[in-house]
Amino acid sequence: MKTGIHPNYKKATVKCACGNEFETGSVKEEVRIEICSECHPFYTGRQKFASADGRVDRFNKKYGLK
C-alpha cells in the first residue's frame, strides 16, 4: 500500500437522536445517526409483528386444507 494516501483513522463519537452516545473508530470525529440499538424497536422489544399471509396460506384457507 502507498503511504500518505489513506485518511487518518481515529476514535469517533457516535451520537443518536435518542441521546445515546458511544465510541468507535472512523475517519470522522463525530457521527450522527437517527436510530441505534438503544431505541430501535427490534432491540428494545417493542417490535410489532405483522401477520401477512402468503399465497400458500390463502390457498389452504380457501380450500379448507390443514
From Swiss-Prot:
Q: One GO term of the cellular component aspect? A: ribosome
Keywords from the named record: Metal-binding, Ribonucleoprotein, Ribosomal protein, RNA-binding, rRNA-binding, Zinc
UniProt entry tagged with the keyword Oxidoreductase: no
Gene Ontology MF annotations: metal ion binding; rRNA binding; structural constituent of ribosome
Query: Mind telling me which InterPro entries this protein's record contains?
Result: Ribosomal_bL28/bL31-like_sf, Ribosomal_bL31, Ribosomal_bL31_A, Ribosomal_bL31_sf
Q: Which positions does UniProt annotate for Zn(2+) binding?
A: 16, 18, 36, 39
The record ties this protein, via PROSITE patterns, to:
RIBOSOMAL_L31
Which GO terms are recorded in the biological process aspect for this UniProt protein? translation
Cofactor binding remark: Binds 1 zinc ion per subunit.
Q: What SUPFAM superfamilies does this protein's entry cite?
A: L28p-like
Q: Which cofactor does it need?
A: Zn(2+)
Quaternary structure note: Part of the 50S ribosomal subunit.
Q: Which family does it belong to?
A: Belongs to the bacterial ribosomal protein bL31 family. Type A subfamily.
Function summary: Binds the 23S rRNA.
Q: What is this protein called?
A: Large ribosomal subunit protein bL31
